[in-house]
């Protein structure tokens, strides 16, 4: 298979006019017709990473079909960082210095996004991550706002992901299935450290005693010993934090007939290809996600899913929803700035974001909030959903207002009888 150079451009939107001036050089609006260049850094070999670049292309095409931003087309400059922090940084640097992007959308991997963040500060480049979850991304902005203010967190922080899973666990696992205990099983990665810290705090409050806490190497290939250890502690459910891995633990969970529900965050399970990837072993798996096919979180959700499926043949991963919204949010910020792409004015406009996208209502936390420039979490904003794989399809099982199915488990999973 042909291997591209780490920072190689994969494709871009056809645009007209000359390339706009370098970011930070011109504080005013560019000439009408000049393209607005947005860099998109993804991971093409990963399910979530490929969804970033694909969704961005759909959003840009839609915006351009409607006349662009006050007559100026969006031009995407797309890179593949191959899930490497160093390659991600090189792509980020090239986006600013050579390709003259006005903003960067980049990476679902926390280690990669955290490596890019200092360059966002140094280059004064507006940067929004559509999938990385580490609390440290927004914590850096909070702790040194003037330096890091160019970074925005376009996905839920690890703390909010954990809280969403705890809210689901309380409403469904505890209240309906009367479960009382759980084992945490997370990959050892930057995003899961704060995730697990929050799990240890909020799962007991949700009604689930934590009887085991396992952090495993993402390179693990045999999960049998891990599942054996968990079973020996007799929890009612497994709460996961997995993204870099997904297929192998799911396949072994089914093959080993582990009699415990698999819930939590399984990022790879958020895409519709996961059924095929696991040969159906994902039946019954529950994961937090941004949305699910057929679930109208807002009037924009299903039209986007349909457009994505029509173009690419499968549904987007969670990063697809966020990236699609982010392209629109950047375009909206430039429009509200009367066309200016000055980085400080971009920051001001992004801070004033109030946008209803595919995932819900977007606003960012302020300078004095704990998670500065992170997505606001909670009712009326973005909470995510929990979906379950049932009969080869993803269905929404939480929250109640969006659910289109009730939780059911494979026959090998032993759970108490649910009550409505």
Language model regions located:
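Beta-alpha junction/loop-to-helix N-cap segments that form part of ligand/metal-binding clefts
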Residues: 33-35, 48-57, 66-142, 154, ...
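Immediate post-signal peptide segment of exported/extracytoplasmic ligand-binding proteins
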Residues: 28-40, 68-73, 172-180
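Segments of small-molecule ligand-sensing domains
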Residues: 310-320, 331-398, 420
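Extracytoplasmic ligand/sensor domains, especially the bilobed periplasmic-binding protein
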Residues: 101-212, 261-284
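Extracellular/periplasmic periplasmic-binding protein-like sensory domains
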Residues: 134, 158, 250-324, 336-337, ...
